[in-house]
């Protein structure tokens, strides 16, 4: 389906817009998130968040380049998830004691 028709579905508030977006760009968005996160579940969550944010933001906005708009949102959510996962307090490292410290 063409981007203009998908965007028109969003403006009509048709839930079919999300289905058409997923059918057209779902694999590309998943691959984009997967390259950033290297985790299937987190990638699926980023794509779902992308669809939700698209549903919330498109009626006032009409993006000229629909895939670029979706990719920007997906990248934003994936990088946010990556930052959250790699936060210093959540990342534990095991360090072995040296001989001097064992005494």
Regions found by a protein language model. Give the residues of each.
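Acidic, Ser/Thr- and Pro/Gly-rich low-complexity regulatory segments
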Residues: 2-6
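A short, charge-rich alpha-helical start-of-domain segment used by transcription regulators
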Residues: 7-31, 35
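Sigma70-family region 2
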Residues: 11-12, 38, 48-66, 84-85
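Residue-level preference for hydrophobic side chains embedded in well-ordered alpha helices
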Residues: 21, 25, 29, 50, ...
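Hydrophobic recognition helices of helix-based DNA-binding modules
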Residues: 29, 33, 54, 58, ...
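Arg/Lys-rich amphipathic alpha helix in sigma70-family domain 2
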Residues: 72-94
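Acidic, proline/glycine-rich intrinsically disordered inter-domain spacer in sigma factors
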Residues: 90-92, 99-103
């Amino acid at each position: 389906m063409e981007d203009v028709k998908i965007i028109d579905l969003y403006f009509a508030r048709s839930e079919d817009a999300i289905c058409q977006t997923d059918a057209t760009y779902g694999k590309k968005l998943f691959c984009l998130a997967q390259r950033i996160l290297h985790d299937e579940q987190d990638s699926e969550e980023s794509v779902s968040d992308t669809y939700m944010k698209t549903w919330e933001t498109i009626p006032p906005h009409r993006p000229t380049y629909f895939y670029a708009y979706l990719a920007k949102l997906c990248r934003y959510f994936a990088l946010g998830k990556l930052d959250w996962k790699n936060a210093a307090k959540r990342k534990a490292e095991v360090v072995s004691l040296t001989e001097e410290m064992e005494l």
